[in-house]
């Protein structure tokens, strides 16, 4: 080994613990330890792997010139990074090739981009080249600090399913000390008892969904390394060398400079856009101005658009990206190695850039409860730089020293979207691949009908007689509501709209609709009374449709003065993040998608999440919220959550926005708490909400529908907006607005107005009793104990990281139906730590405080004691069959008989 080879601070530790050392990029690094590459790969995928990556280069960039400099020398948009975020990026040359790929981390805690501090991490083998390249281009950028911090700042990575739990054990303040549970987030934290400060980032180079990189002072890094292993070794965590790091990144389809980036086998530049994973790392935001390689990369981008849109391309010789990097699964026996030729139809179409045999754990089950078994397998995979015209499914051959290996182009080898595990992806006809379905024999319709009815009856009896339903978004309607919902209007149409020429009279486009006209008028009056408002729209058939109509209506309203131009979207929206319990329908991935603008700075949907308290992530941080409101000036604020245990700060936010020049629309989506609207919970219009939407079937007594309510009457500020929203409902959203359930909703509204005081008081009291009882039973209840853990119908308990689905399944087997729920610190629903429960349905079936105390005892025995109690729960449920808070059974019975006589 050369004398000038460099060593990380952990070099001696590696040697003392069985590290097989090799020279890599000028560094003396472990390629593997005693367990070997295969075991290190498997341990990372099932448990966690610990990597020394201090050999990588770390450059500090700060000062007023930092952003202009980074915008010029990197492909991504540095301005898109808010503090505590990171992004994958590349250092491009003028020809559209990569000098290197890199990661950029924003370290500061401020909001001003001019005060930002960045850390740029580059590949070890390219560090000196990158340093020289970047220094050559820093001239002309004033007030710029550009320093090499590689020696003083160490870097290690902890990757794999157990990584989160291990860090929680060594960090102060437990899970709240970790970064937010989304990719590319970072946070400064401290080792418990050691006073060692470290920056933790949710990034990595393995494809693991649970991934962390840690930046620590070099003189403290061994202490952190050993602390992690001391906690994790007994659970399967191992140190991992460069060998398994390479097989892990290859299985994840990630590029390696010198293989998938840089120069190809002929010495030509590999276009940056040839590698799929690099495309999101290139930004053409106008905020970047002119930057290195912009024109060349724009040409690559335009050609890729033509290809993906299946539009005519230039002749092959004139194409900028004639070859691309594709994942190829080897279907025959053998291993594809770097440099092997790839053939199709006898002709060479490219070569293998990376290839090996990788091990994998087998997942015998499917779905949310699937976990890796003890059985393992191996598969040969490769990344190949081959003809751009190929698509997934194409068959190719790889020349293994004169022997043809069969392969197939695939989309990917690995899936990381279901934390905590990364799962191997197979295709049919390959080893381990999914099996095709079996053809079904023909069955008589009468037999199918009998089977269907049998299953429906069985399920109805089980759900209505034997199970305790604690799903917070469900509620069984009364018999009268159910039967009215299937009367004749269920089969009819009654389209109508208000016509000004007829004095705002509702004009119906069908005959035979007088009942529906009467029903809608009565329903509107009942709901106006319930909400204490002037306007209601009842034709929406779900809460999501209600939200869509409001978003669409607001966008139309914002464009009302100039309808000749392309309509602009809502500039900015403030809402609850989905991972913090926000409604799916209020997200850019939900109903908001087509109506919110893209922020030109972040290049993401222009949505600002409510900040939450560190000590209570279920509670909005009102101090930070006010700062963000004045910083961003949103045009719409959406309150309301699907995981809602507190009152929403309607009045407080109304106060905050009252002095703004351009006031945002304050929208409260009460989906879960619509049936609690009143003095025991919240009265949104009295507190300052502009508009309320909701579902009528969660805490409200109705069948499954939606509603929109407001005080936007004629003569008010938002009169025009309300008219537009009504038009966005019809004809914008519905034609047939499900008339049967509309009839049922009127009956439910009668019940709600008659019994709301008692019901709302009892639901909230029962929820508090249930929460305290669960706590007394030794279960971990989320929420503020000073508020009784909840102010709504919902109760949330934490059952262990990733254990929510399994515990929910165990409870279902014991006739208790709950909803597994990701906690605010969970990465996804697949890693859910919590159970979300609601007491509203069982309260309506007559359960009281003492009954919820008993239920808490049963749940303790099932969750903690792992006892089987299905029969006991079934007997317990049979005490609560008769529905309350509705017309008494004696009065309802003759009405039910009359309805049964006509619907038979």
Which sequence ranges carry the predicted segments?
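N-terminal glycine-rich, Lys/His-bearing helix-loop that initiates the first secondary-structure elements
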Residues: 1-34, 433-522, 885-904
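Acidic, proline/glycine-enriched N-terminal capping motif
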Residues: 1-89, 97
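Flexible, glycine/charged-enriched surface loops at secondary-structure junctions
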Residues: 143-149, 234-247, 405-409, 495-499, ...
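Glycine-rich, small/acidic residue-mixed loop/short-helix segments
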Residues: 270-433
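Conserved small-domain helix->loop->beta segment predominantly found in fold-type I
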Residues: 314, 320, 749, 756, ...
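Conserved PLP-enzyme active-site core in the AAT-like
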Residues: 438-441, 515-518, 522-536, 540-780, ...
């Amino acid at each position: 080994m050369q004398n000038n080879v460099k060593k990380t601070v952990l070099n001696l530790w590696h040697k003392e613990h069985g590290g097989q050392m090799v020279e890599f990029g000028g560094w003396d690094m472990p390629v593997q330890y005693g367990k070997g590459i295969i075991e290190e790969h498997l341990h990372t995928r099932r448990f966690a792997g610990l990597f020394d990556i201090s050999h990588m280069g770390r450059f500090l960039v700060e000062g007023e010139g930092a952003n202009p400099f980074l915008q010029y020398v990197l492909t991504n948009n540095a301005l898109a990074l808010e503090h505590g975020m990171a992004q994958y990026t590349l250092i491009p040359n003028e020809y559209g090739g990569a000098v290197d790929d890199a990661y950029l981390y924003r370290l500061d805690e401020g909001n001003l981009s001019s005060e930002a501090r960045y850390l740029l991490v580059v590949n070890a083998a390219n560090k000196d080249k990158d340093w020289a390249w970047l220094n050559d281009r820093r001239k002309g950028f004033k007030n710029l600090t550009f320093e090499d911090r590689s020696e003083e700042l160490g870097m290690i990575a902890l990757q794999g399913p157990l990584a989160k739990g291990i860090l929680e054990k060594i960090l102060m303040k437990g899970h709240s000390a970790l970064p937010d549970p989304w990719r590319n987030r970072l946070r400064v934290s401290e080792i418990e008892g050691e006073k060692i400060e470290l920056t933790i980032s949710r990034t990595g180079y393995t494809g693991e969904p649970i991934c962390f990189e840690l930046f620590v002072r070099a003189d403290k890094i061994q202490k952190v390394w050993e602390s992690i292993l001391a906690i994790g070794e007994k659970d399967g965590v191992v140190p991992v060398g460069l060998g398994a790091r390479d097989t892990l990144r290859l299985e994840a389809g990630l590029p390696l400079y010198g293989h998938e980036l840089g120069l190809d086998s002929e010495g030509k530049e590999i276009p940056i856009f040839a590698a799929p994973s690099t495309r999101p790392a290139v930004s053409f935001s106008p905020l970047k101005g002119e930057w290195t390689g912009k024109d060349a990369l724009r040409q690559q981008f335009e050609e890729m658009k033509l290809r993906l849109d299946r539009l005519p391309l230039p002749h092959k010789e004139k194409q900028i990206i004639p070859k691309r990097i594709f994942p190829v699964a080897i279907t025959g026996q053998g291993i594809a190695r770097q440099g092997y030729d790839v053939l199709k139809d006898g002709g060479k179409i490219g070569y293998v850039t990376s290839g090996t045999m990788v091990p994998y754990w087998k997942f015998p089950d499917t779905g949310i409860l699937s976990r890796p078994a003890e059985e393992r397998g191996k598969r040969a995979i490769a990344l190949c730089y081959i003809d751009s015209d190929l698509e997934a499914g194409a068959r190719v051959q790889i020349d293994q020293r004169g022997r043809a290996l069969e392969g197939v182009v695939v989309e990917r080898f690995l899936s990381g979207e279901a934390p905590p595990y990364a799962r191997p992806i197979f295709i049919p006809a390959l080893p381990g691949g999914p099996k095709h379905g079996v053809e079904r024999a023909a069955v008589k319709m009468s037999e199918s009908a009998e089977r269907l009815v049998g299953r429906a009856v069985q399920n109805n009896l089980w759900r209505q007689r034997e199970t305790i339903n604690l799903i917070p978004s469900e509620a069984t309607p009364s018999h009268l509501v159910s039967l009215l919902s299937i009367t004749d209007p269920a089969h009819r149409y009654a389209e109508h709209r208000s016509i000004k020429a007829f004095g705002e009279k509702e004009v119906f486009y069908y005959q035979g609709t007088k009942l529906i006209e009467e029903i809608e008028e009565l329903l509107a009056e009942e709901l106006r009374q319930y909400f204490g408002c002037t306007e209601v729209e009842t034709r929406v058939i779900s809460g999501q449709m209600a939200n869509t109509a409001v978003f669409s209506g607001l966008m139309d309203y914002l464009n009302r003065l100039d309808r000749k131009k392309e309509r602009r979207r809502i500039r900015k929206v403030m809402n609850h993040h989905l991972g913090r319990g926000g409604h799916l329908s209020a997200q850019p991935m939900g109903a908001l998608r087509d109506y919110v603008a893209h922020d030109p700075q972040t290049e993401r949907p222009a949505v600002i999440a409510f900040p939450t308290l560190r000590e209570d992530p279920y509670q909005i941080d009102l101090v930070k919220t006010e700062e963000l409101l004045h910083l961003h000036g949103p045009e719409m604020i959406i309150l309301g959550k699907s995981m809602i245990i507190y009152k929403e700060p309607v009045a407080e936010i109304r106060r905050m926005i009252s002095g703004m020049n351009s006031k945002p629309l304050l929208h409260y989506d009460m989906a879960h708490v619509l049936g609690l609207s009143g003095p025991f919970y919240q009265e949104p219009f009295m507190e300052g909400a502009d508009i309320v939407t909701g579902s009528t079937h969660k805490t409200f007594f109705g069948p499954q529908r939606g509603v929109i309510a407001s005080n936007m009457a004629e003569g008010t500020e938002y009169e025009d907006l309300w008219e537009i929203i009504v038009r966005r409902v019809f004809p914008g959203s519905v034609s047939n607005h499900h008339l049967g359930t509309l009839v049922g909703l009127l009956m439910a509204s009668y019940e709600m107005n008659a019994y709301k005081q008692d019901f709302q008081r009892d639901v909230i009291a029962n929820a508090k009793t249930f929460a305290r009882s669960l706590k007394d039973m030794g279960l971990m209840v989320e929420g503020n104990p000073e508020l009784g853990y909840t102010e709504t119908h919902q109760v949330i308990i934490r059952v262990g990281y990733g254990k929510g689905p399994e515990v929910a399944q165990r409870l279902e087997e014991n006739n208790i139906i709950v909803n597994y729920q990701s906690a605010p610190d969970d990465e996804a629903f697949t890693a859910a730590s919590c159970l979300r429960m609601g007491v509203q349905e069982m309260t309506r079936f007559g359960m009281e405080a003492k009954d919820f105390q008993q239920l808490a005892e049963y749940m303790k025995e099932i969750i903690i004691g792992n006892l089987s109690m299905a029969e006991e729960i079934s007997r317990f449920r049979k005490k609560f069959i008769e529905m309350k808070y509705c017309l008494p059974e004696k009065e309802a019975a003759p009405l039910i008989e009359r309805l049964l006589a006509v619907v038979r």
